[in-house]
């Protein structure tokens, strides 16, 4: 039945074309003419990028009222996030998967935000809540080892923040309330005076206990606040220097062993990030970007092995040289991950360092054909030197169609938790492998565009936790196959829509289920319908999960392998600069969990998502 449903969905996508696909006149149907930077670390049209790139715009963030980055990217085809309960602000979760891999690099303005030492996530994107400061989010699906690190096996999430470009000052005030004792207050200010530009954001969020789709109460408490200050100076000639500081702090309470444990665990989080970035146009052909950053992550969960503080310090520099038919990119990345404090079983002061040099050369062989060889050389303080070559071939049939073929290799070192924790193994080997992908970016008409991407990943020395002993081990080889398809259509002046489908198949190991022992779904369908009229706009979003079977050891998860979750957001500008907005989440009160490793609804370690809940608020801009 589910296979027939998936096949029918694909048939609709392939044959019906635009008639099934929608988003509104001013709702963010993202054109393939839009400029993206993540695919090749230099600005280019999305159509020409030789990669599968999805974009979440600032307009989409504002109209749908996403709370954090995790919520914003969850509906991107090919992305799956293991969200525990109400979200990672009151847990230590939000493991990100792209194309079936949890080895994903997260960047803010091109600077790493990954954490090293956490068992449940590689970056705390659910705690990146400064949404007003975001210009757009680029999600690169597929290995991006050459430019972003050999651990970018699944892909890259690059959060691009705003820079005020026009003189003047603009301010946004927002407040909202909802059920489950939800309250939110935010202030955002941006401006430019002469050569100085800035953005300032501050916010506070409160949450209480919630009910799942079966009406059962789940312990949940959150008292969080965040601050963000960016100060920049325009040096002229497309050059600038930017200083940025972010702070996130919270007190929270979660249930001890899953949603229906009545024992509350109280914890704290305290994160901050400081960075300095210099961008310079040295000549008509040569540009330079230099970055230095320091990230701190601190979380304290009673009775958990991963209660610790983590610190990352990094420096990167990149030169881009553009010729008539050639773009040469080269640079280096250095970072150090360390545990300055840990109350668990990993020794305080434990650290690892990695330095890498990379070079990539995009050559236009003809007006239609291009080839991009690349190489990255990493030297890891514990695992030595590894070389990761890559090759991309592009064929631009015309101004509306681009085909590409990519071959990328990767090397993923074990993290500190996998090496040194109670469940770790110091003899683990790095995970290595390659990804082959083929894709098409195509504009059917001025109002309809689509992308298609198919990939195969082969990896060896897979690092996984043993389901019986929980000890980390190298478990052999993995072969991953999948594809994703996305269509965007502007139907009329008022109506628009989008639809995306992704398929994933990972071979089963031993007696386990497919797709990482059932942790990830075989099929995901994402639908968005938008309406825009003068002062009113609304968006209906649906996410369908199919065939996420769960572990062989937890057969009851099969009863919850398929589900749909629908959300609705609406905005009404009742006077100039003033908007009333509302959001209804999980409209049909679906009972589900985003955690594929859950057991059963009445047992420990089941993590129910919230049932139907709402938020209503006011926004003022001046």
List where the protein language model places each region:
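N-terminal periplasmic accessory domains that precede
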Residues: 69-72, 94-97, 107, 124-127, ...
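Extracytoplasmic beta-strand/coil segments of soluble accessory domains associated
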Residues: 70, 74-112
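Short acidic/polar hinge/loop motifs at secondary-structure boundaries
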Residues: 95, 112-141
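Periplasmic-side early beta-strands and strand-to-turn transitions of outer-membrane beta-barrels
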Residues: 146, 158, 165-168, 174, ...
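Face-selective signature of the C-terminal outer-membrane beta-barrel domain
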Residues: 234-249, 266-398, 444, 448-454, ...
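Surface-exposed extracellular loop regions of Gram-negative outer-membrane beta-barrel proteins
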Residues: 249-251, 256, 338, 345-346, ...
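Outer-membrane beta-barrel signature, preferentially recognizing the C-terminal barrel domain
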Residues: 259-281, 308, 400-402, 407-460, ...
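Gram-negative outer-membrane beta-barrel transporters
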Residues: 364-371, 456-458, 474-553, 573-579, ...
């Amino acid at each position: 039945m589910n296979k027939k449903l998936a096949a029918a969905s694909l048939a609709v996508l392939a044959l019906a074309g635009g008639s099934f696909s929608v988003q509104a006149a001013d709702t963010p149907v993202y054109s393939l003419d839009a400029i993206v930077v993540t695919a090749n670390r230099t600005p280019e049209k999305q159509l020409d990028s030789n990669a599968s790139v999805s974009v979440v715009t600032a307009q989409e963030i504002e109209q749908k009222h996403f709370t954090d980055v995790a919520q914003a990217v969850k509906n991107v085809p090919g992305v799956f996030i293991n969200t525990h309960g109400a979200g990672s602000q009151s847990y230590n979760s939000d493991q990100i998967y792209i194309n079936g891999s949890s080895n994903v690099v997260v960047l803010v303005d091109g600077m790493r935000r990954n954490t090293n030492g956490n068992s449940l996530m590689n970056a705390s994107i659910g705690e990146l809540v400064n949404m007003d400061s975001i210009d757009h989010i680029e999600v690169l699906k597929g290995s991006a080892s050459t430019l972003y690190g050999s651990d970018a096996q699944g892909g890259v999430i690059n959060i691009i923040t705003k820079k005020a470009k026009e003189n003047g000052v603009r301010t946004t005030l927002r407040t909202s309330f909802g059920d489950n004792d939800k309250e939110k207050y935010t202030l955002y200010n941006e401006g430019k005076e002469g050569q100085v530009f800035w953005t300032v954001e501050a916010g506070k969020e409160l949450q209480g206990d919630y009910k799942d789709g079966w009406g059962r109460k789940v312990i949940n408490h959150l008292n969080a606040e965040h601050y963000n200050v960016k100060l920049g100076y325009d040096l002229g000639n497309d050059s600038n220097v930017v200083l940025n500081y972010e702070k996130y702090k919270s007190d929270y309470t979660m249930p001890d062993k899953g949603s229906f444990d009545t024992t509350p665990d109280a914890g704290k989080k305290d994160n901050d990030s400081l960075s300095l970035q210099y961008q310079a146009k040295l000549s008509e052909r040569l540009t330079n970007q230099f970055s230095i950053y320091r990230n701190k992550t601190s979380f304290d969960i009673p009775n958990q092995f991963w209660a610790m503080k983590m610190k990352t310090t990094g420096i990167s520099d990149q030169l881009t040289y553009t010729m008539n038919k050639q773009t040469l990119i080269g640079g280096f990345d250095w970072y150090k991950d360390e545990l300055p404090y840990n109350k668990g079983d990993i020794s305080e002061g434990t650290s690892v360092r990695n330095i890498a040099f990379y070079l990539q050369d995009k050559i236009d062989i003809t007006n239609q054909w291009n080839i991009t060889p690349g190489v990255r050389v990493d030297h890891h303080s514990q695992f030595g030197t590894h070389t990761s070559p890559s090759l991309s071939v592009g064929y631009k049939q015309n101004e509306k169609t681009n085909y590409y073929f990519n071959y990328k290799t990767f090397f993923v070192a074990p993290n500190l938790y996998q090496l040194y924790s109670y469940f770790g193994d110091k003899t683990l080997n790095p995970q290595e492998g390659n990804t082959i992908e083929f894709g098409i970016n195509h504009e059917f008409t001025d109002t309809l565009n689509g992308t298609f991407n198919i990939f195969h990943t082969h990896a060896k020395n897979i690092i996984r936790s043993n389901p019986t002993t929980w000890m980390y081990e190298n478990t052999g080889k993995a072969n991953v196959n999948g594809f994703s398809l996305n269509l965007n259509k502007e139907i009329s002046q008022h109506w628009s829509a989008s639809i995306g489908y992704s398929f994933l198949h990972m071979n089963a190991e031993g007696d386990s289920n497919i797709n990482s022992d059932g942790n990830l779904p075989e099929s995901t369908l994402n639908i968005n319908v938008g309406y825009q009229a003068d002062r009113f706009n609304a968006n209906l979003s649906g996410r369908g999960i199919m065939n996420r079977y769960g572990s062989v050891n937890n057969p009851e998860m099969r009863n919850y392998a398929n589900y749909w979750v629908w959300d609705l957001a609406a905005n009404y500008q009742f006077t100039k600069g003033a908007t009333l907005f509302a959001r209804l989440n999980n409209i049909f009160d679906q009972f589900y969990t985003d955690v594929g490793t859950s057991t059963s609804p009445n047992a420990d370690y089941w993590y129910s998502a919230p049932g139907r809940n709402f938020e209503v608020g006011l926004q003022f801009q001046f």
